[in-house]
Amino acid sequence: DAPQGEPDEYGNYPGPMDPFPAQRGEFYTYDDLSVELVDYVRDMGYTHIEVMPLMEHPFDGSWGYQTTGYYAATSRYGNPQQLMHFIDACHEAGIGVIMDWVPGGFCADDHGLATFNGHMLFEHEIHPNWGTHKFDFARGEVRSFLVSNVLYWLENFHVDGIRMDGVSSMLYLNFGIDDP
């Protein structure tokens, strides 16, 4: 029951919402987390939790960082209404919810955004470290898609903050790889 890993400089502990599904043979549900996680976080005296990406993704091992469904709450833990209930339960306990959001790249799987309309609409190139597509931020359609997506999560699910993952890969074309 101890937090996984060491806390960062702000006292945050890393880890997915459900770090041990294989031990139980199933994932916790949003409803389970509404009780167990909320009570635990409140009892520990924390004011906020940061959840890893909640968008749909095909590979469990990615913890949500290889997103395919930017507008779909992952069904691993339940349905969208149950996610809303979980976030409401956090708020009722005085706990804010910060959600990881992944604008730095997206899953290269065929059923994702890659060549969505038969052309390279969203993608720019493959990220060499992650094997994911980079968004083409020069395109207005891409910027509109991403801004609309952030607003979707803030307005519909009432998350209190967004942590943008992989910002350096959006800012620097060398993907954070040091030149010799």
Where are these regions (language model features)?
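Substrate-binding/active-site clefts of carbohydrate-active enzymes
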Residues: 2-180
